[in-house]
Amino acid sequence: MSEEKIYTKFAPNAEKNLVIEVDGEKYERFPVRLPVIMDGDDIYTIIKDAVEGYATADDMIYVSEKIVAISQGRAFKVDEIKVSKLANFLQKYVTKTDVGIGLGSPQTMELAIRELGRVRILFAAAVAAITKPLGIKGAFYVICGPKARAIDGPCHYTIPPFNNYAKLAPKDP
C-alpha cells in the first residue's frame, strides 16, 4: 500500500502532527476513524477491521480509555445519575481546571462515591480538608487512586451522545 494512501486514510485533525518526537525517537501516529462505540460493542473486532491492511505486526495500537469504558457499559447519562447529598456537598470543594471536569460535578462525584465507597471518599475528603490549606494539593486523588482520577464528565468536544455522559474507568482494561 502506498504511503500516500495511508496518510490520506489516517489524516490527523488540523492541529495535530502525524510525527512526534519523544526522547529523541520519532514516532508516526495514524489516527483511526471508528464508528461511535456503544455499550456492548466488541471494540477489538471494530479496531481490527479498521486497521486491516494497514497495520503491521510491529505497530502499536492505542485506544482511549473512554471508548473502552463505553463499550463496557461504564458511561452514564448525566441526567439519569441520582445525585446524593454527599456528592452535591463534596463537589463544591473540587478545584476546577481546564483539563476536564473530573469530580467537579455532582454526577461525577456521585460516580466516585459508588465506585470507591463512601468511607474512602469521606476519608480522602477529610485529609484534603487538612492538607489543602497547608499548600498540599492532590491528597484526595492520591488516597482515592487511579479509579477516581479516571472518572470524567461530559464535555463539548466529545462525540454525541457521549457529550452528555459521565464515565468511570474501564473495568479490567
Q: Which residue stretches match the model-derived regions?
A:
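N-terminal and secondary-structure boundary signal
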Residues: 2-173
